[in-house]
Amino acid sequence: MALNVIKISRVSLVTNSVEPLVLPLTFFDLLWLKLNPIERVTFYKLTESSRDSFFSSILPKLEQSLSLVLSHFLPLSGHLKWNPQDPKPHIVIFPKDTVSLTVVESEADFSYISSKELRLETELRPLVPELQVSSDSASLLSLQITLFPNQGFSIGTTVHHVVMDGKTASKFHKSWAHICKHGTTPQDFDLPTVLDRTVINVPAGLEQKIFQLSSYISEEKDYARTLTLPPAKEIDNDVVRVTLELTEVDIEKLKERAKNESTRSDLHLSTFVVSYAYVLTCMVKSCGGDANRPVRFMYAADFRNRLDPPVPLTYFGNCVLPIDFNGYKATTFLGKDGYVNGVEILSDSVRGLGSRNIESIWEVYEDGTKNMKLDTQNVTVTGSNQFGIYGSDFGWGRPVKTDVMSLYKNNEFSMSARRDEIGGLEIGISLKKCEMNVFLSLFTSDFDIYK
């Protein structure tokens, strides 16, 4: 995709503060220190907007409201720092800190780029900006607005995962949209104003275990002491993405299928459980290869209400923990019982979260990382049908589409609520073409069989 860069600006936040703010990182933040950034692009259709009106009216509103919303999300304008004398990195926010905003223009077909159909990953990559990262400093937020003249625009967001989780990221996007449309701060979003790290009560010693795990991730001697991110998977021209939909009726049929195929009556048949199990089995089958290869899969659980005392809803930062499944082989999910096996595993996990402590959950994740083999197939779900990203209306209508752009790099698939139906899901998939063809065949044919 050819882009014409219009400008690169630095957006400052509105603040009366004169002193720098230093935020230590908690266990929940440090977990994501070496993960690739959260990348999302959200598309907005403009039916009657010329190029001139966009730059004279719409863009200034987006910029002004961005400056205002940053005052409620202070850490996003700061930087991640790791000084040689410090045992761990921290976030530093200076009153005059700014966020990078790139404005570009593209002649690409907006309808195609923002569709749910198969699209080349390389065609969408230019729509998200990169973070500035060095060994001792990293920006935390970078934004890009791409205008498709007389068609629409997109907002590309890249966030360092160390600063916030998906729940807080969705609040940022929706709050920015609300301020842009209404000119006022939203009153019902539980804005993340609590920066006090002492509200995170976890056992001592867990933070150090994160750094000890670094030697299993990279053989580089100084890997644990640098902010530089690990090399991302290369995205070739044979990587494609698609957005699939599960209607509320589809999900009910998945639940009925689980009931019919399982001998158990105690299953936790939530939308999340049955949908994840279905996508997981399709992904394992589409990968091919050795049936005895290891399969490792994960999801992130919100621990705000699971800590003692609970974390305030207005806390700014990460509070999710990866729930790891690393003792399985592909054969578990390949046969006719593959789907119900996945349902039972995930059901037991979700239902048992309340009785598990953080140490035991961490130990499973630690073991999975230490013992992961080169031929391990990794599958992780990102996003949630609770985030409500399609509710972010900047004043020109709700998004027509949103894509998580970090799927292929992180071996993820995305899950979110459907735009136009309560109870349904959108599933974002990014795979090589050969795997995608098999995956789509399985996803649709399996559904036909069990309808």
From Swiss-Prot:
Induction: Up-regulated by high sucrose and by low phosphate stresses. Its EC number is 2.3.1.-. It is an enzyme of class 2 (transferase). The active site is at 161 (proton acceptor), 393 (proton acceptor). Keywords: Acyltransferase, Transferase. One of its GO terms (molecular function) is acyltransferase activity, transferring groups other than amino-acyl groups. Belongs to the plant acyltransferase family. This is BAHD acyltransferase At3g29680. It comes from Arabidopsis thaliana.
